[in-house]
């Protein structure tokens, strides 16, 4: 192995670094595949402020190396530094080593299988509240509707918010963060920009969100019925961390904002893309209807997983090298950020034959190998909420297709990806026309397809 090891950085484009940043942050859907075709399975980019030296890996064996590496050698918290201005320094996404393990252990009880079973009825109830308001034969912006629905769910699960006024204000302000342009996000680390719009508006909005969160934390700390509540905030307030180190308000705030933002928008985007694919695949949609009525969660989950593969919402994971490291045949210098390209891994013809086809059966026949499907990352940094997201998505699909079938409508017949903040969403909102079922489930006496 030593004879094949190359020291330094892999080849990459010689474009000006800030141009690379724009292409990477805003136009990654075509930029990354172009770089992959030109430079191969491992290549370098310069994309400040995200990373001065970014090494992109696409092959499953290299991705496995990264996910299995000692977390002391690869810091994901440092790799995510651009998110720190929103999520906060104590966020489970921003911390490393012992502090990350501590935060993860505190959050984990809220996402166990037992906890997920407890959330399921609530998810279904909220989904029905929203979907029963949809008008038959109407055309909807599915991205907007999925954002509203998943945010309502996550506010109840994470925050336990039922006050309509608090929900409305928090929803409005969180949407302002969700809709942020990548260029604004890239400018957040520069203090001189804080005095100018749109960054001034961004930080003002964040201050108002913090006021709501801290107010709710203070109120919840003195709640005599805390033990009867099952939301994540109440669980965290009841956690006995250590006698000398209870969770501070700042630590609670950072976990809450992380879960509120990361816990709904990615699922909303994945659902809107999945619905758009189903609108163009009537045979698969017919199977989804039967699965919805019959309670076949396995098939519904496979459909969602294929939607996540076909349309990658989060393009990559990042880890900063703390000391010289050997990954994928390269000895990388300290300070390099290693990037597992979820976007390119999901589009691989080797890992996913006919990758542009929407085929949920991939996830039912055992053909999807480890380290080739990566919406939730991997290793010790795998998303804590992966089980929640899959359960939520399957339940929402079930509630939709018990009542409607769908066709594509308007500009969404030619839907294209758009990078919004750090997520990739349908540019036109994935508009759908709602066709009511003849009765609940829309099924006659014929056998399922």
UniProtKB/Swiss-Prot annotation:
Gene3D superfamilies: Cytochrome P450
Positions annotated to bind heme: 383
Gene Ontology MF: a single term: iron ion binding
Cellular component per GO, a single term: peptidoglycan-based cell wall
Cofactor list: heme
Xref: InterPro entries: Cyt_P450, Cyt_P450_CS, Cyt_P450_E_grp-I, Cyt_P450_sf, Cytochrome_P450_monoxygenase
Enzyme Commission designation: 1.14.-.-
Keyword list, A-Z: Heme, Iron, Metal-binding, Monooxygenase, Oxidoreductase
Enzyme class: oxidoreductase
Family membership noted in the UniProt record: Belongs to the cytochrome P450 family.
Protein known as: Putative cytochrome P450 135A1
Organism of this sequence: Mycobacterium tuberculosis (strain ATCC 25618 / H37Rv)
Gene designation: cyp135A1
């Amino acid at each position: 192995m030593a004879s094949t090891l190359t020291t330094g950085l892999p080849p990459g484009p010689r474009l000006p670094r800030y141009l690379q940043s724009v292409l990477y942050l805003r136009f990654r859907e075509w930029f990354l595949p172009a770089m992959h075709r030109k430079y191969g399975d491992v290549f370098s980019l310069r994309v400040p402020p995200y990373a001065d030296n970014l090494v992109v890996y696409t092959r499953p064996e290299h991705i496995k190396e990264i996910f299995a590496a000692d977390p002391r050698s690869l810091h994901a918290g440092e790799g995510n530094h651009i998110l720190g201005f929103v999520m906060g320094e104590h966020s489970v996404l921003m911390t490393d080593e012992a502090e990350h393990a501590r935060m993860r252990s505190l959050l984990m009880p809220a996402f166990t299988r037992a906890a997920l079973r407890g959330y399921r009825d609530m998810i279904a109830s909220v989904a029905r509240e929203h979907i029963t308001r949809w008008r038959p034969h109407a055309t909807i912006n599915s991205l907007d509707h999925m954002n509203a629905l998943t945010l309502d769910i996550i506010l109840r699960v994470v925050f336990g918010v039922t006050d309509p006024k608090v929900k409305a204000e928090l929803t409005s302000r969180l949407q302002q963060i969700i809709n942020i342009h990548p260029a604004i996000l890239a400018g957040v680390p520069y203090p001189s920009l804080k005095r100018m719009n749109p960054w001034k508006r961004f930080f003002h909005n964040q201050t108002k969100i913090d006021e709501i969160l801290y107010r709710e934390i203070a109120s919840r700390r003195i709640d005599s019925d805390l033990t009867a509540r099952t939301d994540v905030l109440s669980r965290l307030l009841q956690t006995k961390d250590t006698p000398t180190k209870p969770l501070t308000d700042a630590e609670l705030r950072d976990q809450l904002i992380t879960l509120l933002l990361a816990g709904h928008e990615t699922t909303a985007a994945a659902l809107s893309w999945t619905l758009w694919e189903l609108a163009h695949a009537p045979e698969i949609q017919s199977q989804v209807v039967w699965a919805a009525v019959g309670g076949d969660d396995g098939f519904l989950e496979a459909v969602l997983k294929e939607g996540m593969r076909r349309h990658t919402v989060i393009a990559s994971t990042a880890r900063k090298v703390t000391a010289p490291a050997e990954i994928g045949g390269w000895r990388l210098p300290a300070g390099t950020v290693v990037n597992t390209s979820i976007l390119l891994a999901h589009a691989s013809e080797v890992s996913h034959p006919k990758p542009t086809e929407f085929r949920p059966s991939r996830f039912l026949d055992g053909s999807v190998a480890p380290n080739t499907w990566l919406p939730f990352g991997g290793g010790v940094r795998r998303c804590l909420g992966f089980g929640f997201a899959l359960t939520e998505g399957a339940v929402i699909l079930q509630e939709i297709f018990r009542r409607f079938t769908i066709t594509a409508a308007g500009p969404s017949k030619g839907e294209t990806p758009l990078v919004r903040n750090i997520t990739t969403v349908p540019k036109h909102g994935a508009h759908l026309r709602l066709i009511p079922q003849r009765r609940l489930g829309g099924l006659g006496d014929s056998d399922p397809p």
